[in-house]
Amino acid sequence: MQNRTLPYFLILPSLLLAAVVIFWPVVHLFEIATHDVNRFGQLREFNDGANFTALFATAEFMNALWRTAVWTVAVVGGALVLSIPVAIILNMDFYGRSVARVIIMLPWAVSLTMTAIVWRWALNGESGMLNSALHGLGLIDTNIQWLASAATAFPMQILVGILVTVPFTTTIFLGGLSSIPDDLYEASSLEGASLWQQFREITFPLLKPFVNIAIVLNTIYVFNSFPIIWVMTQGGPANSTDILVTHLYKLAFRLGKLGEASAVSLIMLAILLVFTVIYIRISTRSEQS
């Protein structure tokens, strides 16, 4: 009996610490989200979920919710599509492979805020590097307002999001590729398998657990990503690039609606929890089958 209960006693301090660090803020958020709150965070009367009702009644929140889904799917999906071939190339034995790996990983080591500042400068409509390059190549005659136009601002931010997510995803896939025995490729080559057949029958099936890890971690990371959107456009022009996290920031620190901002936080937490649980169950069942 003592041997059975000992592990629980050993992890009890960590569980208590996790409860204080994680669950107490969530409980406090729920308390704020279900009460009227002034700008100074003072709770008033219980409002019976009026903050949630007010959110879903506004077009700004619904647009931010939809845009968050597009942002997350596009960035995570784009990063996966780019990272797999990059990881396969970097896993090959060629001269300068170590240097190439360092170059690919460098953007991951740079602050995301600084990266967003550099891209904001590069995409400047008047003196940005991208417009200058396109002018030099003779592809455009007039400057394009990349971040000042609703039609181009969000797609460019998605592109930047993909580029800054690729290094982390590539690192995960490199770890997966290094665990695949070379004997499998040698045996398939002797059987006359092409590179595409090797990828389809060997590489990708054995890489699936790492793909699942990348999807879950990147979804959480991208879903909550604040610097790229905020630094580049602050959700503009005219809230056309707002996602949930920037909409939350505006509600809390610009409009002083702390109750609605807390409600947004709880909705975001619920979305991530539901996604993570469902995806892990689906991936586990597919691996077992």
UniProtKB/Swiss-Prot annotation:
Sorted alphabetically, which Gene3D superfamilies does this protein's record hold? MetI-like (1.10.3720.10)
* PROSITE patterns hit by this protein: ABC_TM1
Tell me the ranges covered by the ABC transmembrane type-1 domain, including all copies: 65-279
- List the keywords (alphabetical): Cell inner membrane, Cell membrane, Membrane, Transmembrane, Transmembrane helix, Transport
An example GO CC term for this entry is:
plasma membrane
Q: Which InterPro entries match?
A: MetI-like, MetI-like_sf
The Swiss-Prot or TrEMBL record describes its family as follows:
Belongs to the binding-protein-dependent transport system permease family.
What is the stated purpose of this protein?
A: Probably part of an ABC transporter complex. Probably responsible for the translocation of the substrate across the membrane.
Q: Which PANTHER family match?
A: BLR7065 PROTEIN, SPERMIDINE_PUTRESCINE TRANSPORT SYSTEM PERMEASE PROTEIN
- Report the protein name in the record: Probable ABC transporter permease protein BRA0749/BS1330_II0742
The taxonomic lineage of its organism, from the top, reads: Bacteria, Pseudomonadati, Pseudomonadota, Alphaproteobacteria, Hyphomicrobiales
